Every structure is written in C-alpha cells, then in structure tokens.
A protein has these predicted regions:
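Adenosine-phosphate binding glycine-rich loop
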Residues: 220
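Class I SAM-dependent transferase core
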Residues: 1-82, 90-93, 98, 111-125, ...
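Catalytic, metal-anchored helix/loop core of enzyme active sites in primary metabolism
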Residues: 224
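Conserved nucleotide-cofactor-binding alpha/beta core module
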Residues: 74-199
Length: 224
C-alpha cells in the first residue's frame, strides 16, 4: 500500500467532503500520522472510513469525525483542553499540536499505557494522561488547569445520553465542549459554548451513532 497516497485519498475523499476545509487541520493530519496510533493488526485499515477496534472493546472514531471535531473546537495555542476517552492517544496528539496543554482521561489501564507509548513516541510533552472514569465529569486537577480547575475546551470521545452538568461547570467563559448526545440510533454531535456565567449555546453538527462511555449518566424515564 502506498501510505501517502492512501492518506491523500482519505483527506480528499472522506474528510474534505465532510465539511472539513480548515487548511491547518488538514495539514496536521499529514504531520500526526494516524497509522502510528492504530493497533498493528489493523494498520491496513488506518485510512478507511470506519471505526477501528482498540483493546478492551473500544474503537477509534472514523477519520472524518476526528478531523471535524478538531475543526469545530478550534483550539488556540493558549488554551487548555480536557479530553475524556484517551483511546490510542491519536486525538490527544492532534489536540496537543493546537493547545497549550491537554489533560486526557482513560478508564482502561491497557489503553492508557498504549496512548502513553504512542504520545511519547511522538515526543509530545504538553499532555498529562490520567487513569480514571470521566463519564460523569472529571474532578481531578492538574497544574495545567486554569482558575477553579476549568478548561477552555472539552472533547468527549464517546457518546452520552445526556451531558452531565459537571462538564458545564468545568468550562471557562467562551469555552467549547464537543459531545455526542443521545441514544442509538439517534445521536447528535454537538458544540456547546459557554456564553456567560449562566448561558450556554448548542449547535448540532451532525447525526451519528457512537458507542457510549461506560458508566454514563442515564436520565430517569419515570413520569408523575
């Protein structure tokens, strides 16, 4: 397989056609090579329009979704990012090239170890990974966080039936959350922006169907 041709085709045929037109994002996909974050058994699928299996029953998102997320959160060099669901470390690596610092949470020890190896192999130092459950929010703090342990951008890599308030409280004024909200088969990729101390705006980006985060909060369906 001609890897560079496959990468070019992925960008031109999958990613551009999914409204990812930001040239900085497209250039970054050539710098951070996706195949380096794909398990060895699935490297031949690195550029396919599909989710790639990871250890522990998890998956990498489709390439077009990773790129669209990166474009829509529009991370700036001075910003701190919280990622829920480190996986293989690929999204963290992309975010690190844009951000001041990335804090990434992974519930599976095997995946955290995999991501740490991959990120270290790229010489990425502006990332801290933690072993923990971030599905209902992240109470941990790090020296990279802003005032009150808040973040400029939060990226949640699995789906949630509802967005816990804990994430909204972690968001700085002007900050953005990317989350996939809903239940299969009707899920929506959303950007939630903090407009003031009490006001948030939500933009629906696309419809999708992604595996939910383990231990995600489920709303009660009881009625009175």
């Amino acid at each position: 397989m001609n890897i560079e041709l496959a990468r070019f085709n992925m960008i031109e045929q999958q990613i551009r056609t999914w409204d990812v037109l930001n040239q900085d994002v497209l250039n970054l996909l050539e710098v951070v090579k996706r195949e380096d974050f794909v398990p060895t058994a699935y490297k031949s699928l690195a550029f396919f329009d599909t989710e790639i299996p990871l250890p522990c029953g998890e998956n990498m998102l489709m390439p077009k979704m990773e790129a669209r997320i990166l474009q829509e959160v529009a991370v700036q060099k001075h910003e701190n990012v919280l990622e829920i669901g480190t996986g293989s470390g690929y999204m963290a690596a992309l975010l690190c090239h844009k951000a001041r610092h990335v804090t990434s949470i992974e519930i599976e020890p095997e995946l955290k170890a995999m991501a740490d190896r991959n990120l270290s192999g790229y010489g990425i130092t502006n990332v801290t990974t933690y072993l923990g459950d971030g599905a209902r929010g992240w109470a941990g703090t790090s020296s990279a966080e802003g005032d009150n342990g808040s973040y400029d951008v939060i990226v949640i890599s699995g789906s949630l039936p509802v967005l816990p308030d804990a994430f909204l409280k972690k968001l700085k004024l002007g900050g953005r959350i990317f989350a996939i909200i809903g239940d299969a088969p009707a899920m929506s990729g959303q950007i939630i922006s903090r407009m003031s101390d009490t006001a948030y705006s939500t933009v629906n980006l696309f419809e999708t169907n992604v595996k939910p985060l383990r231990n995600a909060i489920r709303p009660s369906h009881f009625s009175f």
